[in-house]
Amino acid sequence: MSIQAPPRLLELAGQSLLRDQALSISAMEELPRVLYLPLFREAFSRRHFQTLTVMVQAWPFTCLPLVSLMKTLHLEPLKALLEGLHMLLTQKDRPRRWKLQVLDLRDVDENFWARWPGAWALSCFPEAMSKRQTAEDCPRTGEHQPLKVFIDICLKEIPQDECLRYLFQWVYQRRGLVHLCCSKLVNYLTPIKYLRKSLKIIYINSIGELEIHNTCWPHLIRKLYCYLKEMKTLCKLVFSRCHHYTSDNELEGWLVTRFTSVFLRLEHLQLLKIKLITFFSGHLEQLIRCLQNPLENLELTCGNLLEEDLKCLSQFPSLGYLKHLNLSYVLLFRISLEPLGALLEKIAASLETLVLEGCQIHYSQLSAILPGLSCCSQLTTFYFGSNCMSIDALKDLLRHTSGLSKLSLETYPAPEESLNSLVRVNWEIFTPLRAELMCTLREFRQPKRIFIGPTPCPSCGSSPSEELELHLCC
């Protein structure tokens, strides 16, 4: 029979205070720092929102991570905290012990509240204070700095989530006193005009990740250019399923020039992902030329590129240290792959992931990329499915991966000899050919996770994954 541990004195003190809400409110100014976090948790769990309103006005730490106390943000506790902050921000003289600089509404470490009481208890002792002065104890001088509210925002629908709508209105009414800092902003189906309204409220220079889905390039560039060029701390930029919707070549050229000029200001960009790349077909050099920072991750997928577009990839230093390159479903069967081979040779020392899935590469083109591929000693993931390869070409490809000892996940297409007139796998022919390919590969190295054949498998429905070791469906 297990014996439940008795409550700690700190917990008992907090519970005692919360039994009398009026007493707990009056005691805030003199409440020891060590009691603040457990008392706040208790008040939160008991829905003592009036206590929360008062506690935030005397918060003795620089950060308050609210969302880590709950799975999702709820309106009532948010209103209680913002009401307390409103009363405080409008005062010229603020409480002596109030040190709050950041209200964090992101999904951060849920162990924060369990871990920190002890740390704060330690910091209350003079010996600890003499050894290290934390940011919480550093005096603030001069004018009051704006309160920073951190949040990750995903705009999916109209009307907006009630918490987000309330927060936007609250911040807008306190411009200059509050900065709404958004480390990640994702826009799915929300019209661009609503995204613009959000960007007028968000502190633009705080956005580290931006994703825009399901819009059209002309509209996006016209409406968002003035905001994009100010996102100077942007690290990740994703455009997914942004459509073309213009047949005017002159207008298209102007739009591309205007858009690519944005990248001259993005000095911290590390990831660029553009799904439906056709809009930049023939213009990719303009974009790559404007990149100011060496990228780690480049994804240009789904569409058509010209040979001149491929050539530019190996000509600029911004792509010289790529760790991840994804060109999946960019149709490459009509152009020379020598520029791609040159790029692979250039980034061989850094490349970890290479995705050439569905590019319809023909076996006659393969020799152009094999020397570069064989040099990619850091490669861990290689997707090459849905390309047109003969059994001999696949054997040659596998031989060129013999020195890639770090490969842990790899996919290859079924050889064309196993395909029928409808380009479907004839399993009676395919099964021995796959065994032959595996035998060839094992002469050089032992694969870890490998998938040879159509994806997903029409027989068992499996697709390449980290869990799949060897695809042996018959």
Swiss-Prot record:
Q: Which Gene3D superfamilies does UniProt cross-reference here?
A: Ribonuclease Inhibitor
Coiled coil regions in record:
none
Q: Which residues form the signal peptide?
A: none
The residues bearing each LRR repeat, given as ranges, are: 97-124, 179-203, 204-230, 231-265, 266-291, 292-323, 324-342, 348-375, 376-400
Q: Does the keyword Repeat apply?
A: yes
Q: What is this protein called?
A: PRAME family member 2
Q: What keywords does the record list, in alphabetical order?
A: Leucine-rich repeat, Repeat
Q: Could you provide one GO biological process annotation from this protein's UniProt record?
A: proteasome-mediated ubiquitin-dependent protein catabolic process
- Keyword field contains Membrane: no
Family of the protein in this entry: Belongs to the PRAME family.
